[in-house]
Amino acid sequence: MKYKTLVFGHKGYPGFANWFWATRYDWLRIGIFVSEEIQNKDSCLGNYLRDAISNSVDTGRDWGPKYGKFFYTETPYGLKSKSIMMRGHGYKLLVIDYENDKILEIHSIAADYKPQILIPLIMQ
């Protein structure tokens, strides 16, 4: 490669450190994969995810009270079932209800919708 470029975000972090690019189908595949792995007791990744849940730390946020290893791990948006969530820029959300085998992927760049209303309504 003749030229190398490193992109930095507005807070000074390298671009590769805080962004993950994927299509909505990629996100859905990630959700399915995570849901299957978290339920597999013999899976190394499943053990990693269960460890993220059991060792998550308090966030002080109503919509995601605990966080561990890139996942909000306890009752995201007040869901009653065992669920984890990834959240990104513009309220990009991946909610994985691994107790009831449900996945909600919201591929958004606009933060003006109301996930606190939408998510419990869809995932109930």
Label each region the model flagged.
Residues 114-124:
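Short, gly/Ser/Thr-rich active-site loops of penicillin-recognizing serine hydrolases
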Residues 1-22:
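Active-site helix/loop module of the DD-peptidase/beta-lactamase fold
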Residues 18-40, 92-109:
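Active-site-proximal alpha-helical segments within enzyme catalytic domains
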Residues 23-27, 45-48, 118:
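Stable alpha-helical elements in mature extracytoplasmic
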Residues 32, 40-57:
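A conserved catalytic-loop motif detector
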